[in-house]
Every structure is written in C-alpha cells, then in structure tokens.
Amino acid sequence: GGSSGTQTFNYTGAIQTFTVPVGVTSITIDARGAQGGGSNGGAGGLGARMTGTYTVTPGQVLSVVVGQQGLLQVGGNAQNSSGGGGGSFVFGAGPTLLVAAGGGGGKCNWLSSSPLHPEAAGQITTAGGASSDGNPGGTGGNGGPAGLWSAVPCAGGGTGWSSNGGGPYGGLGYNTWTGGPGFC
C-alpha cells in the first residue's frame, strides 16, 4: 500500500518544501532546469532534465528549488543578450542533494538580428553540446556557460547546484538559484 499522486512545483523565487505522506516509501522526481533567456535571434538554451526514483520515509521533509528563466535585458536595441536560466534542485537535510538539473545558457546577440554564438544547454552527468564557438555545455548539474562574442561573454550561463552560471550575466548558484540578468 501507499499513496500515489503527483505534486508539481513552479518557480516562486523561494525554497519550497514537500513532506513525504504517510505510507509512502519511494518517490519519483522529475526536475528541469530553467531555460536561458531569449533574444531577438531566438530562444535561450534549454535546462537539463533529471528523473530518478528515491527511497524516502514518511514525514521526511524535502526542499525544492525551481529555477527562474533567464532574463532578457530590455534596452530597445538589437544588441540585447540574455541571462542564464536558474537550476532546479531537490535536497534533504544537510543539505543532501537528490536531484540537480542545471539551467540553460542565455542567448548572445551582439550587433546582429541573428545569434552569433548559440547558448549551451544544461546537462546532468555528461558534457552538453558545444556552441558554435566551442563553448561547452554544463556538467554534473552545472548550468550551460555564457554565450561569447569575440571571446567576450555577452550572455549569462545557466546556474548549477554548486556553481554560478558562466560569464558576467550568469545565474547564481547554491542558496540563490536565480536566472541571470540580461546585457545591453
């Protein structure tokens, strides 16, 4: 026996909690990092997705962080680039990490109506695909790095569990987990 059901958490800007119900001894978690911010050249990189089943005890309290989508700098010109997405995480006391899904990198768009260097997606355990300038994707729950323009970071990298997003406009890591600002 045991309870079955689904509970969905959305971005709130705060740590949320889940208390394991009576009779439940295992849960399946499907966590997704937030997408990086888009720009006039298209959408930002997708956040990583992590799914796993975990042994729990009734009454156990888990903390849930849902990442924020990367923010677009509103400047009214074609040079807008965006911040990286926030990571999404589930952890117990300590904190003991159960799931880390890094956020996607923001779109870099500099003096162009199309993206010069695409963002990188967040990943879980393997390196993500590189952008056109060779900028690698995130690893181990870290977010994707910033997009580059002539070797200058011009969009934020996505947030990971233990690291901030790459570049000056990256999302913030542990204890903050927010999407990064845009750049104009």
Residue ranges and their predicted role:
Residues 1-13:
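Boundary/junction segments of secreted and surface-exposed precursor proteins
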Residues 11-22, 129:
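Surface-exposed ligand/attachment interfaces on beta-rich extracellular proteins
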Residues 15, 36-38, 73-76:
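Short amphipathic, basic-aromatic surface patches that mediate peripheral association
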Residues 21-28, 57-61:
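Extended extracellular/luminal ectodomain segments enriched in beta-structured repeat modules
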Residues 26-42:
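Calcium-regulated, polybasic anionic-phospholipid
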Residues 45-168, 180:
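Secretome/extracellular-domain signature
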Residues 169, 174-176:
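A motif-centric signal for short, conserved binding hotspots located
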Residues 176-184:
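Extracellular low-complexity, Gly/Ser/Thr-rich intrinsically disordered linkers
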